Every structure is written in C-alpha cells, then in structure tokens.
Amino acid sequence: MAIDPQPSSPSLSSETIANDTIGNDNNVNEPSVEPKTQGNQHTVPPRLSRIYSQAHHISQSFIDQNYPGEGTTQAPYRINFLPDDTQNAQLLPRWKKWAFVLLQSLACLATTFASSAYSGGIKQVIRAFGISQEVATLGISLYVLGFTFGPLIWAPLSELYGRKKVFFFTFMVATAFSAGAAGAGSIASLLVLRFLTGSIGSAPLSNAPALIADMFDKSERGLAMCMFSGAPFLGPAIGPIAGGFLGEAAGWRWLHGLMAAFTGVTWIACTVFIPETYAPYILRKRAQHMSKLTGKVYISTLDADKPPSSAAHQLKNALTRPWLLLFKEPIVFITSIYISIIYGTMYMCFAAFPIVFQKGRGWSQGIGGLAFTGIVIGVVLCIISFAFEDKRYARAARKRGAPMEPEDRLPPAIMGSLLIPIGLFWFAWTTFPSVHWIVPIIGTVFFAWGLVLVFMALLNYLIDSYVIFAASIMAANSALRSLFGAAFPLFTRQMYDGLGVQWASSIPAFLALACVPFPFLFYKYGRQIRMKCEYAAEAANVLQKMRSLHVTVTEDDAMNEAEEMWRARTHNSHASAAHSHGHRRSLSYTRSV
C-alpha cells in the first residue's frame, strides 16, 4: 500500500535559528519587507520571528534551492524533499522508525483492549443497572460497531490535515469519552459513550498502517506490518484477562478508568514523540509558508498535477468507494467475507468463554479471563512465524529477479485456513467438564494462530492485487469485519442456550471449514480471476504504467480510468447488441418478404 512519507524533523538548534531561519510574518508591529529575489534565490526578511521557523520548519536553505518553475501562478515553483531533509520520514534513523511503530501499535492495542476489557465487568454492569445479558453485551457490540465508521472518516482526514493532528484530536476525545463512561449514570449513557469511544478512538486502526507506509519502503514494510498486525488481535485477547480481575475486585467503573488511563498514556506518548510523517501534507504546508514568506508561488510536486480536492469530496469518496469495490469485485467480497467470519468468531469468544468456563466449570470472573491466554499465545506464535515468512518471501523475490505475483502472498493463508477449523472443532468437542481445562485452551491456540495467518496473508494479497485502490479495499474490509465483530456476540448466548456448548461452538467451525477452499482457489486461479475483475485489471495496468514510466498515479485517477473503461465497454456492448438486434430484424423482414 503506497502511502507517502511524513515525519517532522527535530527542532532546529538556537544557533541554526539565529543564522538560518525565517520568522513569523504575522507580527503586525513589524514593517512589511519585500523579499529580494535573484532568479530562484530569495532572501528572507531578517527581522521575522523565530517562532515561525520553529513551528513550520522553514529555513533559508529551503528558499535557496533551485526549484523548477518561475514562481508565478501559471508556473509555480515545484518543491520536493531535499536529499538530507529531516522532515522526510523515509530518511529517519531505523531506531526511530521502529520506536514509532511500537508507539502506534500500542495505540491500536489500547483501542482494541478497550473493546473486550468491558466483558470483564459485564456482571457488575448487569447488577448496577438491572439489565439483561443481551443489553449489557451491547457495550461490546456498539464499541466494535464504531470501528465500521471511524476509519472511513479518519483516513481521508489524515490526508487533508496530517496524521499527527488527526491522532491528537481523536485520541484526546476518545480518552475523555472513556473516562466519561466510568462515571455513566445510566445504561443508555454508557452505551452511547462506548459507541463514540470506538468510533473516535479507531483512528489508529487505519492511520497506523499509513504511518508505516510513510516511513518504510516496500522491502522493509512487511516486518513492520507484521509487528503492527498483532495489536488488533492481542488487544481483544488481553482485555478480558486484565478486565476479569479488575472488574471482580474493584467494579466496572474502575475498569473503564483503566481503559481511559491506557488510552491517555498512549495519546500523550504518541503526541510527544511521533512527528508528522505524511509527505503530501508536509510539502503542501511548506509550499504555503514559503509562498507567504517570499511572495512567490510554490506548490508541492505531489500536488502539482492533481485537481483541487475538498474535504467534502474526499469524505464522499471515502464513504462510497469502499462499498463499490466490495460489491463489484469478487476477490474483495469473498476474502472480506472470510476475514469477517473469523474476526466475528473471535469476538463471539468474549460472550462464549464465560458460558464455557465460568458457568460450565465454575471458574471465577478473574480466573475465567485467563481462558483467553490461548488466544494470546496463538497471536504471538503467528507474529513470530510471519517474521520468518517475510524473510522467505524476500528471498523468493530476490531469486526470481522480477516482481512477485499477488498469489505468492497466499501460502500462509492456506496453512491458516486449515488451522482455524482444526482449532475450533478441537475447542468445541473438548469443552466437557470431564476434560481437563487445558485441552480446549490448546485448541484456541491453533484457532488464533490460523486466524492471524489468514488475516495478514489475505490483506497482503488484496494490497498487492489492487495496489492503487488499496486504501479503499482496506476500508471496505475493515468496515465489513467490524460489522461481523459487532453482530456475533449479540446472538451467542441464545445460540449456546439452544444448541448446547458443543454444537454452538461448532457453528463457526463449520463456517470456517466451508471457507477453506478459497485460499487454494485464489492461489491456483487468482491471476485469471483478477484479469476478469474490472478494478483488479485496472490496478495491474496502473502498476505496469508506474513501473515502465516511473510515474505516480493517484487512486482518484485510477478510479476515473477504470470507470471510463467500464463505460466504454458498456457502450460497445450496447452498440453491438443493438447492431445484432437490427441485423436480426433485417433478416426477419427479408425472410417475410
């Protein structure tokens, strides 16, 4: 998924500021000084404030560069990062990149931790408000439902206003709402605050992968994504463990206080240490400030050939385009359904495990949370195994000496597709109280291992298959799986009451078993299927163009081109049908005469 780079550099030293900086042109007490220009060289007014330089990272060295263009509205100077530009995220030291990945992964962990930690205090919520189990479970479902809508909004806004601003605002508000939930006076206010926290706090789920793409090139991105991808699964697995003990000992309000504290600490850490990393935003703001300071017109090279796009236009595309691709592309639809089923099964466990271990075996609320240890172990095993898979893929790419096919991403999904039903059936039919408790938990290790293998491999497959449409594809996948994750816990209790523990636990196992052929089919026939899919074929054409001509094509450009091709094919097919129909009528008339 190609997303442009971003971070801001360390602050300029005081000596650098004194000798090589630009100040604040908003000081009304300073006389207006016109900059002197010599060709493309501009002398900055010497009395401008240091604050401007520190805030916007503009130094005289940026102004002194020889940029293409004439500095006019018709032919603006086109700026790009300098060779040693400290604001270019791709040039950050490796240790900083990995530190930022760790911090963003913690932010995702905090968000997903809160989705399931609530289950640890669900008994206390029922007693406090006198509600049913189903109503109390809405606290999980509504939170996860927020994951459906949040990323669709925050992803495009991060491209307009930068990753850092969007994260700062969303996580600040999410922390406040999470703290507010701790003091909720009614079940209605608690559920509303849970939904809002999930919606607003879900920004890292979409922006963290974008930040990784900002900092790492494709050869390094796999390992970083592997590290990040564990967070959305570790969080829900760890949540009931911590939540079970705290909810039992201190009550559900303290549990929400823990969620707010976790979110707040990660908000502060990420805000303080992670700079802006989105290259188009950095260069856009730099061009605006340089234009303001010099009186000349500057524009980012990344924006130079793009038509202006408003926030409303980007939001419209963000909200509609994912669903268009989801329902028009068979590959996207099938893989998203598969991922959604196994993702929903994971969230079903938060309602099923208390039935199996607390009700069935008499475990306490805190000890019952430890049943999720198997899922934690499975996720960790998958992260380790995927690190080796990433090295295998890199070796295969070097050996081939040519671009790898998207289908080369699928071997882990094939393995994972087998592990999931094995683990689920293992769990289902070893839940009898007469069987030692460790046996069903071992089954959840295989389930979680397979789940994350399938999840990561299929997402990589979709990204490589759709390239320029990857952002919309990821949004569609995220929205659909969040809907499943919100829905599955709601019918879990009724299903277990009606079918019994063993058969109810087998339902998702049968669904996973039905999905086993999909990775095999895509591995063998994926290329032929992609070439018959409208947008996958266009993505392949765009990728070929980018490789041969070394040009950058935006998602909007590719979408427009794909839609034009589709309209042309539709017009040609209609014209052909009309011609054929007219020909048949002519023959019929000739025969009748």
Swiss-Prot record:
Pfam families: MFS_1. InterPro entries: MFS, MFS_dom, MFS_trans_sf. One of its GO terms (cellular component) is plasma membrane. It comes from the Eukaryota. The keyword Acetylation does not apply. Glycans are attached at residue 19. Keywords: Cell membrane, Glycoprotein, Membrane, Transmembrane, Transmembrane helix, Transport. It is found in: Cell membrane. SUPFAM superfamilies: MFS general substrate transporter. It is a multi-pass membrane protein. One of its GO terms (molecular function) is transmembrane transporter activity. The chain crosses the membrane at residues 98-118, 135-155, 167-187, 195-215, 227-247, 254-274, 337-357, 367-387, 410-430, 438-458, 468-488, 503-523. Belongs to the major facilitator superfamily. DHA1 family. Polyamines/proton antiporter (TC 2.A.1.2.16) subfamily. Efflux pump involved in export of fusaric acid, a mycotoxin with low to moderate toxicity to animals and humans, but with high phytotoxic properties. Constitutes a self-protecting mechanism of the fungus against critical levels of FSA within the cell. PANTHER family: MAJOR FACILITATOR SUPERFAMILY, MAJOR FACILITATOR SUPERFAMILY (MFS) PROFILE DOMAIN-CONTAINING PROTEIN. This is Efflux pump FUB11. It comes from Fusarium oxysporum f. sp. lycopersici (strain 4287 / CBS 123668 / FGSC 9935 / NRRL 34936) (Fusarium vascular wilt of tomato). The gene is FUB11.
